[in-house]
């Protein structure tokens, strides 16, 4: 057996010894090295010894250094376990060692809660003196005073109130201690709370006061005490019920009757002296002192000496008694409390006023003081008025059977009942009027609320419609802007594509012209004599390319034959090609005619300015490239003319060729200028057309938007008229 197993066995034995209170075994096990073990519920030996009340074991464990505030599975400490059983000695020992007083278990209860719940006032007193929190609440929001009031522990309640606990604190349901005591019908606790100036008008979360709770649970004595303490019977709960209506709803007639007489109870509860009691009793006896025959009549006996004068005396006496009772209601309340033969009054009907009650029946109740007679009258109700045999002054008449009948002179005995019914009818009429007034007020308030609600809805609808219209307007404007932007971009793209196509077409035409010109020159070279082939090839290289042969002046230029014929044929072909194009105008034709009729001196002047014209007039890459090459080709010729005079044949051959190229370049320049002007005009026309189309489309969209806005405004007006008609 290992050392750990031995220590575990010793710890288990320590638990058993602490549970059984075996002091010697506990000491031996601690000396042997037993450690603190726990049960399946998480309780230490200190928990077990404190719960079982083994004070020596607790003292030994405390001296051994056991932890005081260890909590079990229910989060209870040893102080909780000792407080549950009310062992004051162990509680005092734990407090002396410095245990935590306000440690809460899983339900939020402290040791003071446990002492108050179980009613251990001495334990509560020890905890309070040690500094326990009197106002601590558990998870349900209950203080220790709530728990003491719930279980009717008056001594613990008194201790807590003296310690400073507040009776008006509410739990999570909104109940005060007075609510709890009224719910569980604890009269002594209610009296204690009322002496501590507890408020009787506090409401819980349902809006109920303590009087509502007593009325709902049929606690008549509690309701009476609360009424004597000044509870308001007109307070309404969340269901809109007063305590009287609550008692009627729960079918509690006794409490309902008590609440209907609440002003009488309040007057009855005021302080009275014996002298006033005796004076009132004497006055009541004097009012009840009647002749013997009237006393007999009041007892319900039938005598032959009944006369109308005695009946009138009884009526006068009853009127005097009613006046006295209305002046002093306390004997009336006393009589109501004493008599038990009174028929039960429903809680749903109004109490009968004293003036409407039958005088004979009241006399019977006051005159019969014998218990047997009271028991006899308790079960039997008074006979109807017509069943009395009345011997008085009467008039004789014969009935249908011919028998002699008698009728009273002073009227029927049903008059009190009729008067009572009339009074009840008037009371019901007043109640109905009051209810109608309250219903009318409620209807007015509801109608006002509905009107405010409809106005608010109308304002919301107006705002929504305005926002919707503005959103649609902005959306339409955005769409128009996007549409115009897209059309503009498409027009620009079309223009760019047309410009590119025109450029490519022009380039193709220029290339074709150059190819034809180069082909004609090659044909002329082929027709020339073999003696001039080398010079003609040198001249072609100088004119066409700017190679290394242009820099060398070894081979002199040779003039080609038939240069005039070539010049005329080249100009005719160029004019035919340019005239065959579809995009040239009248200006281009005039330019061609003028260039064809230029004199020779202007051609020579243009030959000198061929280089600048090429650099300035060309707008394509091909013409831009051909200008410098031709300019470079012309430089050696100029230098040769400036250096040494060339032969006559060379000057005659190079002159026409240079004039042809300069004329072709000038023609292409004029051609591109005409094309560019025509393209600019075409661009302007297209832009104007696109702008006009966009403006027309914007006008159309604007008109449609205005029509849509008008339709929406008409719908809004229809909605407003419909809502007004519904209201």
UniProtKB/Swiss-Prot annotation:
Gene (name only): ANKRD6
The UniProt keywords, alphabetically, are:
ANK repeat, Coiled coil, Repeat
Q: Which InterPro entries match?
A: Ankyrin_rpt, Ankyrin_rpt-contain_sf
Subunit and interaction comment: Interacts with AXN1, AXN2 and CSNK1E/CKI-epsilon.
Q: Which segments show compositional bias classed as Polar residues? A: 298-312, 566-584
Please explain the role this protein plays, according to its UniProt record. Answer: Recruits CKI-epsilon to the beta-catenin degradation complex that consists of AXN1 or AXN2 and GSK3-beta and allows efficient phosphorylation of beta-catenin, thereby inhibiting beta-catenin/Tcf signals.
According to the UniProt entry, the coiled-coil residues are: 417-446, 682-727
Q: Point to the regions of Basic and acidic residues compositional bias.
A: 280-296, 314-324
What name appears for this protein in its UniProt entry?
A: Ankyrin repeat domain-containing protein 6
| Gene3D superfamilies for the chain | Ankyrin repeat-containing domain
Under SUPFAM superfamilies, the record lists:
Ankyrin repeat
Chain residue ranges for the region called Disordered: 277-386, 548-586, 601-657
Any matching Pfam family: Ank
């Amino acid at each position: 057996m290992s050392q750990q197993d031995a220590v575990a066995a010793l710890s288990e034995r320590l638990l058993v010894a602490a549970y059984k209170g075996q002091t010697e075994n506990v000491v031996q096990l601690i000396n042997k090295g037993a450690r603190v073990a726990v049960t399946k519920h998480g309780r230490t030996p200190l928990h077990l010894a404190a719960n079982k009340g083994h004070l020596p074991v607790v003292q030994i464990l405390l001296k051994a250094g056991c932890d005081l505030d260890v909590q079990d599975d229910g989060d209870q400490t040893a102080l909780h376990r000792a407080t549950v059983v009310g062992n004051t000695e162990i509680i005092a020992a734990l407090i002396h060692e410095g245990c935590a007083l306000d440690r809460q278990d899983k339900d939020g209860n402290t040791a003071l809660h446990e002492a108050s719940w179980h009613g251990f006032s001495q334990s509560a007193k020890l905890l309070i003196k040690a500094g326990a929190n009197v106002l601590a609440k558990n998870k349900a929001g209950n203080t220790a005073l709530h728990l003491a009031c719930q279980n009717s522990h008056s001594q613990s309640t008194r201790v807590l109130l003296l310690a400073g606990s507040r009776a008006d604190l509410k739990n999570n349901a909104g109940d005060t201690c007075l609510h709890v005591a009224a719910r569980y019908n604890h009269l002594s606790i209610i009296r204690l709370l009322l002496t501590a100036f507890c408020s009787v008008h506090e409401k819980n979360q349902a809006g109920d006061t303590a009087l509502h709770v007593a009325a709902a649970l049929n606690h008549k004595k509690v309701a009476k005490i609360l009424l004597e303490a000044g509870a308001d019977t007109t307070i309404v709960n969340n269901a809109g019920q007063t305590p009287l209506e609550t008692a009627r709803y729960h079918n509690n007639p006794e409490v309902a009757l008590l609440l209907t007489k609440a002003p009488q109870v309040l007057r009855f509860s005021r302080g009275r002296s014996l002298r006033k009691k005796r004076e009132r009793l004497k006055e009541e006896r004097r009012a009840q002192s009647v002749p013997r025959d009237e006393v007999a009549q009041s007892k319900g006996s039938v005598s032959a000496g009944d006369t109308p004068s005695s009946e009138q005396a009884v009526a006068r006496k009853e009127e005097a008694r009613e006046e006295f009772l209305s002046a002093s209601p306390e004997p009336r309340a006393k009589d109501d409390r004493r008599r038990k033969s009174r028929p039960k009054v429903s809680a749903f009907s109004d109490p009968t006023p004293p003036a409407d009650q039958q005088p004979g029946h009241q006399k019977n109740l006051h005159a019969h003081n014998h218990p047997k007679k009271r028991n006899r009258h308790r079960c039997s109700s008074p006979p109807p008025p017509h069943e009395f045999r009345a011997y008085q002054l009467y008039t004789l008449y014969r009935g249908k059977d011919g028998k002699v009948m008698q009728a009273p002179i002073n009227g029927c005995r049903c008059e009190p009942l009729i008067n009572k019914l009339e009074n009840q009818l008037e009371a019901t009429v007043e109640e109905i009027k009051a209810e109608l007034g309250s219903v009318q007020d409620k209807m007015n308030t509801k109608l006002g609320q509905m009107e405010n609600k409809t106005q608010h809805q109308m304002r919301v609808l107006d705002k929504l419609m305005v926002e919707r219209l503005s959103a649609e307007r902005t959306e339409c404007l955005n769409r128009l802007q996007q549409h115009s932007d897209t059309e503009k971009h498409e027009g620009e793209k079309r223009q760019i594509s047309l410009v590119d196509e025109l450029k490519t077409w022009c380039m193709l035409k220029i290339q074709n012209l150059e190819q034809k010109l180069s082909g004609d020159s090659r044909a002329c070279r082929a027709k020339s004599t073999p003696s001039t082939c080398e010079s003609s090839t040198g001249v072609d290289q100088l004119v066409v390319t700017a190679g290394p042969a242009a820099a060398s002046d070894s081979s002199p230029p040779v003039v080609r034959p038939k240069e005039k014929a070539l010049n005329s044929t080249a100009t005719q072909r160029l004019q035919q090609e340019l005239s065959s194009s579809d995009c040239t105008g009248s200006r281009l034709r005039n330019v061609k005619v003028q260039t064809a009729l230029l004199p020779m001196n202007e051609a020579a002047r243009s030959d000198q300015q061929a280089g600048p014209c090429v650099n300035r007039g060309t707008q394509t890459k091909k013409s831009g490239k051909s200008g410098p090459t031709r300019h470079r080709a012309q430089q050696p010729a100029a230098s040769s003319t400036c250096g040494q005079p060339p032969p006559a044949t060379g000057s005659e051959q190079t002159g026409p060729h240079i004039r042809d190229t300069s004329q072709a370049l000038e023609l292409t320049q004029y051609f591109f200028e005409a094309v560019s002007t025509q393209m600019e005009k075409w661009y302007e026309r297209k832009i104007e057309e696109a702008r006009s189309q966009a403006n027309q489309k914007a006008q159309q969209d604007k008109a449609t938007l205005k029509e849509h806005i008008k339709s929406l405004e008409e719908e809004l007006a229809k909605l407003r008229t419909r809502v007004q008609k519904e209201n």
